[in-house]
Amino acid sequence: MAKTIIVSNRLPVKLNIENNQLSLQVSEGGLATGLGSIYKQDGNIWIGWPGIELEQQDQKIAAQALLAEENLVPVFLSEQEIQKYYEGFSNEVLWPVFHYMPTYALFEKEYWAYYKSVNEKFRDAILGLIEPGDTIWIHDYQLLLLPQLIRDVTPDATIAFFQHIPFPSFEIFRLIPWRSEIIAGMLGADLIGFHTYDDVR
Protein backbone atom coordinates (compact mmCIF):
# COMPACT_ATOMS: atom_id res chain seq x y z
CA MET A 1 0.00 0.00 0.00
CA ALA A 2 1.26 3.47 -0.90
CA LYS A 3 2.28 5.59 2.07
CA THR A 4 3.04 9.20 2.90
CA ILE A 5 6.58 9.95 4.02
CA ILE A 6 6.65 13.13 6.09
CA VAL A 7 10.09 14.74 6.27
CA SER A 8 11.13 17.59 8.55
CA ASN A 9 14.22 18.77 10.36
CA ARG A 10 12.90 17.45 13.68
CA LEU A 11 10.81 14.43 14.51
CA PRO A 12 7.55 15.09 16.41
CA VAL A 13 9.23 13.60 19.48
CA LYS A 14 12.51 14.20 21.27
CA LEU A 15 14.74 11.29 22.14
CA ASN A 16 16.06 11.40 25.71
CA ILE A 17 18.77 9.29 27.32
CA GLU A 18 19.24 8.88 31.07
CA ASN A 19 21.23 6.17 32.82
CA ASN A 20 21.81 4.65 29.38
CA GLN A 21 18.05 4.25 28.92
CA LEU A 22 16.24 5.79 25.97
CA SER A 23 12.80 7.37 26.16
CA LEU A 24 10.59 9.54 23.95
CA GLN A 25 9.14 12.93 24.82
CA VAL A 26 6.30 14.27 22.67
CA SER A 27 7.03 17.59 20.99
CA GLU A 28 4.67 20.51 21.51
CA GLY A 29 5.55 22.22 18.22
CA GLY A 30 2.92 23.25 15.71
CA LEU A 31 4.09 20.86 13.01
CA ALA A 32 4.02 17.90 15.38
CA THR A 33 0.52 18.83 16.51
CA GLY A 34 -0.81 19.48 13.03
CA LEU A 35 0.51 16.30 11.45
CA GLY A 36 0.42 14.07 14.50
CA SER A 37 -2.49 11.97 13.30
CA ILE A 38 -1.30 11.58 9.71
CA TYR A 39 1.99 9.76 10.19
CA LYS A 40 0.39 7.14 12.42
CA GLN A 41 -2.08 6.03 9.74
CA ASP A 42 -1.85 3.39 7.02
CA GLY A 43 1.86 2.69 7.25
CA ASN A 44 2.86 6.34 6.93
CA ILE A 45 6.20 7.38 8.43
CA TRP A 46 7.97 10.52 9.62
CA ILE A 47 11.68 11.10 9.00
CA GLY A 48 13.73 13.63 10.97
CA TRP A 49 16.40 14.38 13.53
CA PRO A 50 15.55 12.95 16.98
CA GLY A 51 16.91 15.97 18.87
CA ILE A 52 19.97 14.34 20.41
CA GLU A 53 23.43 13.26 19.30
CA LEU A 54 24.12 9.54 19.68
CA GLU A 55 27.71 8.46 19.08
CA GLN A 56 27.55 4.76 19.98
CA GLN A 57 26.22 2.36 17.37
CA ASP A 58 24.31 0.27 19.90
CA GLN A 59 22.48 3.39 21.06
CA LYS A 60 21.56 4.24 17.48
CA ILE A 61 20.19 0.73 16.91
CA ALA A 62 18.15 0.93 20.12
CA ALA A 63 16.86 4.37 19.16
CA GLN A 64 15.81 3.16 15.71
CA ALA A 65 13.85 0.31 17.26
CA LEU A 66 12.14 2.57 19.81
CA LEU A 67 11.21 5.16 17.20
CA ALA A 68 9.99 2.52 14.74
CA GLU A 69 7.24 1.64 17.23
CA GLU A 70 5.83 5.12 16.55
CA ASN A 71 6.34 5.04 12.74
CA LEU A 72 9.34 7.36 13.11
CA VAL A 73 12.71 7.12 11.33
CA PRO A 74 15.70 9.04 12.69
CA VAL A 75 18.35 10.91 10.74
CA PHE A 76 21.27 11.03 13.16
CA LEU A 77 23.27 14.26 13.10
CA SER A 78 26.48 15.17 14.87
CA GLU A 79 26.86 18.25 17.05
CA GLN A 80 28.99 19.78 14.29
CA GLU A 81 26.27 19.19 11.71
CA ILE A 82 23.64 20.77 13.95
CA GLN A 83 25.85 23.80 14.57
CA LYS A 84 26.69 24.37 10.89
CA TYR A 85 23.59 23.18 9.03
CA TYR A 86 20.87 24.16 11.50
CA GLU A 87 22.20 26.89 13.79
CA GLY A 88 24.44 28.11 10.96
CA PHE A 89 22.92 28.08 7.48
CA SER A 90 19.27 27.56 8.40
CA ASN A 91 19.12 30.10 11.23
CA GLU A 92 21.89 32.55 10.37
CA VAL A 93 21.34 32.73 6.60
CA LEU A 94 17.87 31.59 5.59
CA TRP A 95 15.90 32.74 8.64
CA PRO A 96 17.01 36.40 8.60
CA VAL A 97 16.89 36.72 4.80
CA PHE A 98 13.46 35.11 4.55
CA HIS A 99 12.21 37.48 7.28
CA TYR A 100 13.55 40.53 5.41
CA MET A 101 16.45 41.09 7.79
CA PRO A 102 19.46 40.36 5.53
CA THR A 103 21.81 42.57 7.55
CA TYR A 104 21.77 39.85 10.23
CA ALA A 105 22.75 37.07 7.80
CA LEU A 106 26.16 35.39 7.90
CA PHE A 107 26.95 34.03 4.43
CA GLU A 108 29.57 31.47 5.45
CA LYS A 109 30.72 28.94 2.83
CA GLU A 110 31.17 26.31 5.54
CA TYR A 111 27.53 26.69 6.57
CA TRP A 112 26.49 26.09 2.96
CA ALA A 113 28.66 22.97 2.68
CA TYR A 114 27.05 21.48 5.78
CA TYR A 115 23.58 22.45 4.61
CA LYS A 116 24.12 20.51 1.39
CA SER A 117 25.60 17.46 3.10
CA VAL A 118 22.80 17.21 5.67
CA ASN A 119 20.15 17.53 2.96
CA GLU A 120 21.94 14.64 1.24
CA LYS A 121 21.73 12.64 4.48
CA PHE A 122 17.97 13.14 4.52
CA ARG A 123 17.79 12.09 0.86
CA ASP A 124 19.63 8.86 1.63
CA ALA A 125 17.24 8.08 4.49
CA ILE A 126 14.26 8.57 2.18
CA LEU A 127 15.72 6.48 -0.63
CA GLY A 128 16.00 3.55 1.74
CA LEU A 129 12.25 3.66 2.40
CA ILE A 130 10.46 4.96 -0.69
CA GLU A 131 8.37 2.57 -2.78
CA PRO A 132 6.36 3.08 -5.99
CA GLY A 133 3.23 5.13 -5.34
CA ASP A 134 4.51 6.80 -2.17
CA THR A 135 4.13 10.53 -1.56
CA ILE A 136 7.02 12.44 0.01
CA TRP A 137 5.92 15.51 1.97
CA ILE A 138 8.87 17.75 2.87
CA HIS A 139 8.59 20.58 5.36
CA ASP A 140 10.34 23.89 5.74
CA TYR A 141 13.44 25.90 5.06
CA GLN A 142 15.96 23.49 6.55
CA LEU A 143 15.38 21.10 3.63
CA LEU A 144 15.10 23.34 0.57
CA LEU A 145 17.52 21.25 -1.49
CA LEU A 146 15.83 17.95 -0.74
CA PRO A 147 13.12 17.82 -3.45
CA GLN A 148 15.60 17.94 -6.33
CA LEU A 149 18.08 15.67 -4.55
CA ILE A 150 15.35 13.03 -4.46
CA ARG A 151 14.20 13.80 -8.01
CA ASP A 152 17.71 13.26 -9.36
CA VAL A 153 17.62 9.65 -8.15
CA THR A 154 13.91 8.82 -8.44
CA PRO A 155 12.48 10.90 -11.32
CA ASP A 156 8.96 9.52 -10.94
CA ALA A 157 8.61 10.24 -7.22
CA THR A 158 5.62 12.28 -6.01
CA ILE A 159 7.08 15.13 -3.95
CA ALA A 160 5.38 17.99 -2.11
CA PHE A 161 7.11 20.81 -0.23
CA PHE A 162 5.61 23.26 2.25
CA GLN A 163 7.35 26.42 3.46
CA HIS A 164 6.36 27.30 7.03
CA ILE A 165 8.05 30.71 7.17
CA PRO A 166 7.82 33.69 4.78
CA PHE A 167 9.48 33.56 1.39
CA PRO A 168 11.14 36.83 0.39
CA SER A 169 10.88 38.95 -2.71
CA PHE A 170 13.51 38.46 -5.40
CA GLU A 171 15.23 41.70 -4.39
CA ILE A 172 15.97 40.16 -1.00
CA PHE A 173 16.38 36.53 -2.04
CA ARG A 174 19.06 37.37 -4.62
CA LEU A 175 21.39 38.43 -1.79
CA ILE A 176 21.99 34.75 -0.99
CA PRO A 177 25.08 33.59 -2.94
CA TRP A 178 23.59 30.10 -3.40
CA ARG A 179 20.14 31.30 -4.51
CA SER A 180 20.19 29.36 -7.81
CA GLU A 181 20.90 26.04 -6.10
CA ILE A 182 18.20 26.72 -3.51
CA ILE A 183 15.53 27.50 -6.12
CA ALA A 184 16.55 24.47 -8.17
CA GLY A 185 16.21 22.32 -5.07
CA MET A 186 12.71 23.56 -4.34
CA LEU A 187 11.58 23.12 -7.94
CA GLY A 188 12.23 19.41 -7.68
CA ALA A 189 8.83 19.22 -5.96
CA ASP A 190 5.60 18.57 -7.86
CA LEU A 191 3.72 20.88 -5.52
CA ILE A 192 5.06 23.78 -3.44
CA GLY A 193 2.95 25.37 -0.71
CA PHE A 194 3.31 28.73 1.03
CA HIS A 195 1.38 30.43 3.83
CA THR A 196 0.28 33.50 1.90
CA TYR A 197 -0.21 34.79 -1.64
CA ASP A 198 2.54 37.35 -1.03
CA ASP A 199 4.99 34.50 -0.44
CA VAL A 200 3.99 32.91 -3.75
CA ARG A 201 4.65 36.14 -5.63
PLM region spans:
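Short, well-ordered alpha-helix to beta-strand connector turns
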Residues: 41-42, 133, 189
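Membrane-proximal helix-turn-helix segments that form the acceptor-binding/catalytic region
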Residues: 125-127, 176-192
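Short His-centered aromatic/hydrophobic patch
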Residues: 140-143
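N-terminal low-complexity, Ser/Thr- and acidic-residue-enriched intrinsically disordered segments
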Residues: 1-81, 159, 176, 198-201
